[in-house]
Each structure stands twice: as C-alpha cells, then as structure tokens.
Amino acid sequence: MPTTHQLPEPVIAARANLLMQHPFFASHLLTKQRIAFVPETPTAKTNGKQITLGDWFSARPLPQRVFVLCHEVLHDILGHMDRARMYTARGFGPDMNVFDTTRWNKATDYYINSILTASKIGIMPAEGLLDPRYDHSLTA
C-alpha cells in the first residue's frame, strides 16, 4: 500500500484541500480509509476500506478531484459497501435471490452526487451520474 510520500502530487493536493475546506470528509479519509494509486484505474473506486485512484483522477482539475474523493468517502460513511455485501449474501428484491451490484452502485452514485452538488463540494466530473428527478427521492 502506498504511503503519503508515494502518492502523486494531484492526490496529495486534493487531500490537503479536504483538510482545509472539508474537515468532516478529511477526518474520515485520514482515519478510516487508505488511498492506493494504481495508474490504470479507470475512474475511482472504494471497497469501504481503501480508495483506489489512478491517472484518470490525477488528470482532473482540483475541484473535480475534491468532489471525487468526497464521493468515495461518502460511500463508506453511508455504509454502501457493507449493505451491498449484505444484500449479495441475503438476496434482495422481489425474488430475494438476486442482487444487481451494478444497479446498486449507480443508485448510490446518483444519491451521493446529489448531496455533493447541493452542498457545493467541489465540481462533479462530466461523467458523474446526476439527475434532478432523483433529488430528495433516493434513500441509498
């Protein structure tokens, strides 16, 4: 696992911005999650314990990097990974034996992006999922 001095400057700058501008997210990031840098990571991802970032993240302007870091932290704060594991193990839905992880991830992304954009935390990348039809109607 990379340590702070092994992370590229764009990652360190985004983390420093969180410390100064968004201490709630920074405290969670610094105490509950690790950051790994894997250049070929297509966007960003988390398993609830580690956030994996790559060249895609580094190429973004700082406000987008801040948004993405807060997005990944919120997945953990809101328990999305834990609930996905539980639903996968138990089953979920009308037939109680199928859980669609892709659909779950998209739904939680819509929810998180709605929170972050309404709170004016960073700037969501163009690839982000956001639809005003879902504002205030999701409970992920």
Walk through the language-model features, giving the residues of each.
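Short, functionally important secondary-structure microenvironments
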Residues: 1-66, 73-140
